[in-house]
Curated annotation (Swiss-Prot):
SUPFAM superfamilies: Immunoglobulin (SSF48726). Residues 328-458 are annotated as: CH4. This is Ig mu chain C region membrane-bound form. One of its GO terms (cellular component) is plasma membrane. It is a single-pass membrane protein. InterPro entries: Ig-like_dom, Ig-like_dom_sf, Ig-like_fold, Ig/MHC_CS, Ig_C1-set, Immune_Resp_Modulators, Immunoglobulin_dom. Its main location: membrane. It comes from the Eukaryota. Residues 223-327 are annotated as: CH3.
């Protein structure tokens, strides 16, 4: 009897919409195999195994002179919607060969994104040095979830200062599943006042959706698209330094604020103490407001969900947005390098710039601080770039921070320490110290190499002279 390997086919349930309240049934059909013994198993996209409790394998059925069998797995749609999974992997073991098959999740319907950009209020620029604020781009109501967001300034792609959050499932009841994504771009006040044109470009299913904004947009008479809500997750720096997580719910495009209420609640419905702050009226006659609440850092790090609820007389029903710490991003600790000032700069005897290079970390949230003789320096003493993707390492990021000190401080032997905080580090923080002696070590190595070469050269010359002398004496003796 000849052996026959199974041929695999994907099976997807056609019943019901992909919503938070039901299960997604995925199936795998194996046909035309011989002998009849076959074993099914399932795994996620990242190769983690699916519990056998959710897997059901049906009896083998004879079809002609060969056999067929099916396996079914039930996955909570909530996990599917809030994760990054695009497919499951059906694995079939057979005596003749092992086969794998990708089974993609169903897409109820194809819906384009609604793209909006929040313009920063004039008083939102802050910083003792270069004053900065953020543009926020949000794409909502789209399906399927595959999407990308990029920023342009005056038609040129912006690579730095961009922070894009993972795609999230929108909270809703019945109906097709839709998703949302938000991206933030850090801008300087001088660039904003220079009338630069910023574009948020959303690529969904190969179609571009552009939204342009500039300072002149503040004076636009275009009607407001309606109240917008942007939940902002706490940064790692705030969580690590304060040991608490600050949740921010930003509400924009308010025509009035008398009936506004912003509240935060934990996953079990327990209300959190929420402080609400309302800005002054913007040039387009709208208001913005923020609702802030603090929770324990441990609760945030554990992945607990928190919901912001906004009510207003202009809203037909409350707007709710849920956030939690993303777990899908792979963690990778940073490598930290501290570089002393360049000799060319020290020759000028004006200032000394120390650089801290932080490479190869994930997720992108990181903080960098500087210390002098163990004491923290004010943030206006140094400049840290926004995390940017590593060109040769997809999924990893890098940043650098430059500290400028006086030439006198550097030459006097002052020590400067770069402190880096990141959630993937063993103790959440690491540091590297540099001083004039570090520069000396580099110089000493170079000087030692030069001295070694000089000594070696001398020995080589003496050896050649002695060899020449010996040869000459030998010739005279022969004669």
């Amino acid at each position: 009897v000849s052996l026959s390997s199974p041929t695999l086919y994907p099976l997807v349930s056609c019943e019901g919409a992909l919503t938070d309240g039901n299960l997604v049934a995925m199936g795998c059909l194996a046909r035309d195999f011989l002998p009849s013994s076959v074993t099914f198993s399932w795994s996620f996209k990242n190769n983690s195994e699916i519990s056998s409790r959710t897997v059901r394998t049906f009896p083998v059925v004879k079809r002609g002179d060969k056999y067929m069998a099916t396996s079914q797995v039930l996955v909570p749609s909530k996990d599917v919607l809030q994760g990054t999974e695009e497919y499951l992997v059906c694995k079939v073991q057979h005596s003749n060969s092992n086969r794998d098959l990708r089974v993609s999740f169903p897409v109820d319907s194809e819906l384009p994104p609604n793209v909006s950009v929040f313009i920063p209020p004039r008083d939102s620029f802050s910083g003792s040095g270069t004053r900065k604020s953020r543009l926020i781009c949000q794409a909502t109501g789209f399906s399927p979830k595959q999407i990308s967001v990029s920023w342009l300034r005056d038609g040129q792609k912006v690579e730095s200062g961009v922070l894009t959050k993972p795609v999230e499932a929108e909270t809703k009841g019945a109906g097709p599943a839709t998703f949302s994504i938000s991206s933030m771009l850090t801008i300087t006040e001088s660039d904003w006042l220079s009338q630069s044109l910023y574009t948020c470009r959303v690529d969904h299913r190969g179609i571009f959706f552009d939204k342009n904004v500039s300072m002149s947009s503040e004076c636009s008479t275009t009607p407001s698209p309606g109240i917008q809500v942007f939940p902002i997750a706490p940064s790692f720096a705030d969580t690590f330094l304060s040991k608490s997580a600050r949740l921010i719910c930003l509400v924009t495009d308010l025509t009035t604020y008398g009936s506004l209420n912003i509240s935060w609640a934990s996953h079990n419905g327990k209300a959190l103490d929420t402080h609400m702050n309302i800005t002054e009226s913007h040039p387009n006659a709208t208001f913005s407001a923020m609702g802030e609440a603090s929770v324990c850092a441990e609760d945030w790090e554990s992945g607990e969900q928190f919901t912001c609820t906004v009510t207003h007389a202009d809203l037909p029903f409350p707007l709710k947005h849920t956030i939690s710490k993303s777990r899908e991003v792979a963690k990778h600790p940073p490598a930290v390098y501290v570089l002393p000032p360049a000799r060319e700069q020290l020759v000028l005897r004006e200032s000394a710039t120390v650089t801290c290079l932080v490479k190869g970390f994930s997720p992108a949230d990181v903080f960098v601080q500087w210390q002098q003789r163990g004491q923290p320096l004010s943030s206006d003493k140094y400049v840290t770039s926004a995390p940017a993707p590593e060109p040769q390492a997809p999924g990893l990021y890098f940043t650098h921070s430059t500290l400028t000190v006086t030439e006198e401080d550097w030459n006097s032997g002052e020590t400067f320490t770069c402190v880096v905080g990141h959630e993937a580090l063993p103790h959440m923080v690491t540091e590297r110290t540099v001083d004039k002696s570090t520069e000396g070590e580099v110089g000493a190595e170079e000087e030692g190499f030069e001295n070694l070469w000089t000594t070696a050269s001398t020995f080589i010359v003496l050896f050649l002279l002695s060899l020449f002398y010996s040869t000459t004496v030998t010739l005279f003796k022969v004669k």
